[in-house]
Amino acid sequence: NNFFQGYNLLFQHSLFASYMDWFHAFNCSLLLGVLVFVTLLFGYLIFSTFYFKSKKIEYQFGELLCSIFPTIILLMQMVPSLSLLYYYGLMNLDSNLTVKVTGHQWYWSYEYSDIPGLEFDSYMKSLDQLNLGEPRLLEVDNRCVIPCDTNIRFCITSADVIHAWALNSLSVKLDAMSGILSTFSYSFPMVGVFYGQCSEICGANHSFMPIALEVTLLDNFKSWCFGTME
């Protein structure tokens, strides 16, 4: 199963994304097993057709095998799939912090609904504003800061055209549409800064509305909240 772990995928930095990565590897392993089995089965059928062509033989065992094998494969896919759906449902039941994300042409606005007065706009930094080590076209003037090991509910919407709030390293992509509030919950087990971009073509400056999400310790998050509201 680990043969395909992380194959062609980014390293995932959240629990749910890690489970999805494992499920992808598990399915790839199953598909490889199915490919080998079907190849051997067809080889056996072709061989037996020519070898026993003068005899009348009923392939009852082969028919039974072709009925049981797909059923087992489907059950092996169903169990982890339902487990992931159940886990995702539990994540959406409870949250410790709600962050409202609004897409504009061409920047993002963040509002912490549980912390009165904490809201700001996030614009891409120009080249002359970048500090050493900050990525070009991805760094912003105000990052969205959240605490780690905390269940966060994100509410995504738009103030104008359709946008998409996407962070590939977290397996997050949700459309931001005017008049519609899309929600999802996430928990981040590790600290760090994660970058993304609007992945819906939204106008001339579509390529210049990046996303910067900073995950930090709870004490640092509290200090950041007080400092931002001053």
From Swiss-Prot:
Name assigned to this protein: Cytochrome c oxidase subunit 2
Gene Ontology molecular-function annotations: copper ion binding; cytochrome-c oxidase activity
Documented EC number(s): 7.1.1.9
Binding site for Cu cation A2: 198, 200, 202, 206
Transmembrane segments: 30-50, 64-84
Cofactor note text: Binds a dinuclear copper A center per subunit.
Subunit comment: Component of the cytochrome c oxidase (complex IV, CIV), a multisubunit enzyme composed of a catalytic core of 3 subunits and several supernumerary subunits. The complex exists as a monomer or a dimer and forms supercomplexes (SCs) in the inner mitochondrial membrane with ubiquinol-cytochrome c oxidoreductase (cytochrome b-c1 complex, complex III, CIII).
Family stated for the protein in its record: Belongs to the cytochrome c oxidase subunit 2 family.
Organism: Caenorhabditis remanei
Keyword set, alphabetical order: Copper, Electron transport, Magnesium, Membrane, Metal-binding, Mitochondrion, Mitochondrion inner membrane, Respiratory chain, Translocase, Transmembrane, Transmembrane helix, Transport
